């Protein structure tokens, strides 16, 4: 089993996509990259943390390259601190790696993707230093709240788009 931690906008959206994938064992939303011991309120108030999803996966069933490819399909890696209507540093695009092999793979992936994108890719690659699990009510949010307004307006269409691709 391996882990990768991704930030690409609202963590509810990112988790909703990855928790459905074959080979993904578990997902957990949290915060990384800012002040210690964050809360949702402190993150929304700009404490420097990023909304992220920790993805625990079986590399025999799904590769990191497949995960990163999907990650770049579900968010805009050329947008600085913004995804759709979600604006703020907590929504920046980032790949937190745990080992050098994953770092190199991510760097090579972005280099190849840049040949496809007309705008500059701003996704950062950084070693995971600290990770804080988000509050329980954020975990598996779409599964637990499928009829909530944001879920219907933003997450459900994203899932439909991915399924049709």
Swiss-Prot record:
It catalyses: L-methionyl-[protein] + [thioredoxin]-disulfide + H2O = L-methionyl-(S)-S-oxide-[protein] + [thioredoxin]-dithiol; [thioredoxin]-disulfide + L-methionine + H2O = L-methionine (S)-S-oxide + [thioredoxin]-dithiol. InterPro entries: Met_Sox_Rdtase_MsrA_dom, Met_Sox_Rdtase_MsrA_sf. The keyword rRNA-binding does not apply. The active site is at residue 10. Keywords: Oxidoreductase. GO terms for molecular function: L-methionine:thioredoxin-disulfide S-oxidoreductase activity; peptide-methionine (S)-S-oxide reductase activity. One of its GO terms (biological process) is protein modification process. It comes from the Bacteria. Its EC number is 1.8.4.11. Has an important function as a repair enzyme for proteins that have been inactivated by oxidation. Catalyzes the reversible oxidation-reduction of methionine sulfoxide in proteins to methionine. Belongs to the MsrA Met sulfoxide reductase family. This is Peptide methionine sulfoxide reductase MsrA. The lineage of its organism: Bacteria, Pseudomonadati, Campylobacterota, Epsilonproteobacteria, Campylobacterales. The gene is msrA.
């Amino acid at each position: 089993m391996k882990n990768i931690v991704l930030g690409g906008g609202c963590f509810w959206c990112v988790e909703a996509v990855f928790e459905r994938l074959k080979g993904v064992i578990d997902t957990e939303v949290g915060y990384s990259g800012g002040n210690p011991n964050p809360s949702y309120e402190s993150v929304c108030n700009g404490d420097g943390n990023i909304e992220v999803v920790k993805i625990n996966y079986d590399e025999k069933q799904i590769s990191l390259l497949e995960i990163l490819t999907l990650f770049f399909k579900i968010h805009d890696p050329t947008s600085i601190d913004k995804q759709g209507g979600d604006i703020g540093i907590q929504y920046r695009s980032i790949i937190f790696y745990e080992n050098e092999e994953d770092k190199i793979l991510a760097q090579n992936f972005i280099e190849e993707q840049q040949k496809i994108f007309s705008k500059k890719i701003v996704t950062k690659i950084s070693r995971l230093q600290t990770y804080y699990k988000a509050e329980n009510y954020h975990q598996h949010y779409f599964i637990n709240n499928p009829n909530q307004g944001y879920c219907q307006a933003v997450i459900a269409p994203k899932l439909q788009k991915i399924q049709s691709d």
